[in-house]
Amino acid sequence: MVSKEQKLALIKEFGGDEKNTGLAEVQIAILTAEISNLTEHLKMHKKDIPTRRTLLKKVAQRRHFLDYLVKKDVNRYKEVIGKLGIRK
């Protein structure tokens, strides 16, 4: 789970304003943070199947946001994957 402070920092970094939470970039950044937290959890708890399912759902959700961003603005897409270190 991403803390409130981490989420607020991501919103400010990718959205510009703390009320601008709906941007695809902000959603992708928050999902990426949640995915990394779940990945770390699964490294320690390998048999936690419900968490693995949640991880896969979040990865798919992030993929949808990335696909949307590619259709709308390729430059913003490249900027986001560069900042977050996401593979294409």
From Swiss-Prot:
Keywords: Ribonucleoprotein, Ribosomal protein, RNA-binding, rRNA-binding
UniProt entry tagged with the keyword Transit peptide: no
Pfam families membership: Ribosomal_S15 (PF00312)
GO CC annotation, single: cytosolic small ribosomal subunit
Lipoprotein in keyword set: no
UniProt GO MF annotations: rRNA binding; structural constituent of ribosome
Transmembrane segments: none
Task of the protein: One of the primary rRNA binding proteins, it binds directly to 16S rRNA where it helps nucleate assembly of the platform of the 30S subunit by binding and bridging several RNA helices of the 16S rRNA. Forms an intersubunit bridge (bridge B4) with the 23S rRNA of the 50S subunit in the ribosome.
Family from the record: Belongs to the universal ribosomal protein uS15 family.
Assembly: Part of the 30S ribosomal subunit. Forms a bridge to the 50S subunit in the 70S ribosome, contacting the 23S rRNA.
Protein name: Small ribosomal subunit protein uS15
High-level lineage: Bacteria, Bacillati, Mycoplasmatota, Mollicutes, Mycoplasmataceae
Gene coding for it: rpsO
